[in-house]
Structure formats: structure tokens, C-alpha cells
Amino acid sequence: MLIKSEYKPRMLPKEEQVKKPMTSNGRISFVLMAMAVLFACLIARGLYLQTVTYNFLKEQGDNRIVRTQALPATRGTVSDRNGAVLALSAPTESLFAVPKDMKEMPSAAQLERLSELVDVPVDVLRNKLEQKGKSFIWIKRQLDPKVAEEVKALGLENFVFEKELKRHYPMGNLFAHVIGFTDIDGKGQEGLELSLEDSLYGEDGAEVVLRDRQGNIVDSLDSPRNKAPQNGKDIILSLDQRIQTLAYEELNKAVEYHQAKAGTVVVLDARTGEILALANTPAYDPNRPGRADSEQRRNRAVTDMIEPGSAIKPFVIAKALDAGKTDLNERLNTQPYKIGPSPVRDTHVYPSLDVRGIMQKSSNVGTSKLSARFGAEEMYDFYHELGIGVRMHSGFPGETAGLLRNWRRWRPIEQATMSFGYGLQLSLLQLARAYTALTHDGVLLPLSFEKQAVAPQGKRIFKESTAREVRNLMVSVTEPGGTGTAGAVDGFDVGAKTGTARKFVNGRYADNKHVATFIGFAPAKNPRVIVAVTIDEPTAHGYYGGVVAGPPFKKIMGGSLNILGISPTKPLTAAAVKTPS
């Protein structure tokens, strides 16, 4: 018997197909195909540029050059205490060429005209332009604006103008020895331009630009090399242009009248040590320093050492009074005497003089006897304290420290001769500074060419009472009977001292070469101004300090007091009173 089965096999569900991952060979194939397509595009683009747009792109590339252009920092302006500009930088243009990119030389006519405009010989221009390996060569720097425009009108290819700054000195030779000058790159070379270089110069910047073949900037480009310039600091000096003008003019008159070799004047603010004027003659134009010789460029007030002669005597007298070695009532025997074989004498013989008389008559004998009351070492230390033999650190090239030999090397006569200004040397600026110890009530002040906001700290040399006493004694020098009456200023008590020194030439003191000095202050009771004048080697109309340097001192002192608005301290004489017209 057959049995029918009811069994039906169960069907398994259909498995879902899973895609096989791409093999490494597949990925490589894909990348290669993509690169092939990209490469084909590049080839196509290159063919397009080489054929369809070649001429256009070549012309544009030839006409545009990427350059890094200097952005010069503007050098700081220098002005006097009242704002008169003494030195400034003005925009100018300089011309350079790119011989490397020149396809052909400028025509003969163009070169001839360019030569005329920039004042460079044609053969020099041609030699510059024939240096084909160079991509930069200066043709002429700091052109006059009108000249620059005429050069541009020539349409010279591969001649490029660069913006620069040129230093100008509006006052010309008036401030030459103080301000100094810069080189063509704007770096200080002498005077305050050199000593204040770090403050004045600033820091140059840079800009990446696109220029055409004529050198014109067609675009500025973004670049990490771009940097804004940092301009220099403006400097306000202590100098007063009005007083400087007066001092310079009077100095030149004196040098001419006495047919002298040279002259120097220094004017100080007696209360602060600020330098109000400093002038030398001969001088030079700092706008054209290359035309000046070494004699004209020398800042004699700072570099030249002088033996001060009798101008040193007030300090010796002050020291003796300050130490109690003498008093105003003592009379000294002032007849000639000897130290060993060496005589000490005065121009005129005075049997005896009190301290006032020693000052007024400028007695070598009396001053030397006061100096002899101190040891050599003590006098050496005293002169050193006054700044003799010590550099002032003014920053001026060639600044002298003066000369003060060690006391152990002094011969017996030298302590005496130093007391009346022989055997020690200092600059006129150092001498003027020493006088601040008298005008500032015994305190020696530092000097400054920059305007001071606060009074400086000085060094005490004498007691206040001593300084006042000596100032009063020094008024007698400009009064009748004194050696400095030529320096008297009407309406003011002027304290002063004359100095006449023979010059040391070829190992001996010359009989016919002198330095005439006159230095003083006013008003004597409350000094505001110190004026120091030296005339070097006067050959006409006298040689004594009072005769030669006294008259310019008088004019400069009187004018300075008037400029500063200082009222007279005593009645004017009838001759000085001007009747209104």
C-alpha cells in the first residue's frame, strides 16, 4: 500500500548580496585615470597659452616687474626752543636704471639731454648703462623736482624713479657746527645729527609693488615683506635762533675787524646750563658740506683747547675765600717775585692789592699767592672738579677733555702759572660751563643742547655765600678801573673776566700769537645769561682780551638780555636812552 507523504521542504530566505570592496588595483586605476585627465587639461591649457594668448601675455609680463620698494622713515625735525625749524627732511626723487632689462640704449640725443639735466657726463652715463649684468645702478640721487619732471618727459625705458628724503638746513651756515649734517643716505655725520642719530633716524619700511617698464607703480601687492616706516623723533633744542644770529654776526664782525684767524662764542642760560647759542667762524653751509675744508667744519668751541689766561682767576679767588684762606679785607704784597729762577709779575706793578683789587686789576702775583696757600694735589683736585681734563660727553666728534697734568709732575712754578691760566687747557664750552658754578650759587651744572623741562641736578663746588661774593667782586672788572670796561652793558651790573694768553707754538710761547678771551654774566646779582667769546690770533687793533673780545661780548650780552625780556637792574645812562622819533 502506497502511503502519500505530506512533507514540503522549507525554502531558505534569499541571502542579500554584499558588494565586494574595491581592490587596491582598482583605486590605483582610478587615480591614474584622474591624473591623466588633469594632465591632459594642463597640456591643453599650455597649448592655449603658447598659441592663442602668447603674444598678449608676453607683452604684459615684459611690461610689469615686481619690486620691493623702500619706504624711508622721515627723519625727525630739529627746531630751536621757539619752534624755528633748523633741520628737516623733504620728499625728493632719485633716478636709477636697470641695464639688465634694456633692449637698446637711449638715443644720442636722449643721453645728451639726460646728461644736461642730471649733471652727469655722457660717457659716465653710457658706462653705467653698458653694465648689462646689473639690475640696479644709480644715475642721480635727490633730484630737484623740476629736473625730475623733465627727465620723466624723456620717456626713457628701464629708468626708474625712487622716492627718497633729502635733508635741508634752512638757516644755512648759522647753526652748521651745532646741527652738523647727514650723508646722502640720511645718516648723521657730524654735530647733533650724529650724536642724536638713534632718536632722529627712525626705521625704514618696505612695500612690494608692480611697476611698468617706465618705472611707474601700477599696483601694490600683499606681501609679508610689507612694513610701515617708523618715523624719527622730533627734537627741540635749547638754542635760540635770535641769540644765535646775534652771536654769529657779532663774532664775524670782530674776527674781520681784528683780522683774526678764527673766533668762537658760547651763550648759556645761567640758571639751567642750557646752551642758547654756539657759533664759530669760519663756518660752512651744511647743505653743501663737501665744499667745506677741515678748518671751516671744525667745531672749535668743543674741539679746540685754549689756555684760559686770566679767565681762570675768579675760581682761584673763590677757592681761597671758600676755604677761609683769605677775606675781603686782606691786602697782599703784589710786587714781582720769583719761584726758583722763574719770575711772577703783573703787566703793571702794584705794591699791594686787596682781593677786590686782585680781581679788578687781574693780578697774576696776587692770584698765585692765593693758590700757594693750597697744596698741589688740592689744587689739582679743584681744577678737576671744575671739569678741566674731564670729557663732557656732548656727543660731538672730536670733543676734547682739556689738559690737566697730574699734580705729581708739576714743576714748582706751574702751580703759580696755572692760577693765572697757563699750563692747563680746556675748550671754551668747558670754560663757560665752569662759570655756572659761580652763577648758580656754587653749583656746577651739566650742559644741554636740548630744552630742559626741569632744572638739572648739579654738583656743589662752593658755598652759596662764596659764589655771591665772587660775583660781586667780578662786577668791578667792568667798572672804571677794571680790565673789562669794554664789556660793560648799560642798565646792568655785569660780572666778567678778561683773558689774554700767548699761544704755545713749536714748544714755546709765541710773542706774536695770542688768544683773546672775555667771559661774564648778567645781571650779576641774579645771573640769567653767560657769554664767552674767544678771538684766535688777532693781528690788528690790539690783542688783549678786554680790547678784542670785550666789544662783541658787550653786543651779544646786551642783545641776549633784551631778547629774553630781562629788565635792566640799574638806571640807563643818558647815551643809552633812545628818544622816540
UniProtKB/Swiss-Prot annotation:
Gene3D superfamilies: 1.10.150.770, 3.30.450.330, DD-peptidase/beta-lactamase superfamily, Penicillin-binding protein 2a (Domain 2). Changing residue 566 to V: In strain: CDC84-060418. The active site is at 310 (acyl-ester intermediate). Signal peptide: none annotated. The keyword Ligase does not apply. One of its GO terms (molecular function) is penicillin binding. This is Probable peptidoglycan D,D-transpeptidase PenA. It comes from Neisseria gonorrhoeae. The gene is penA.
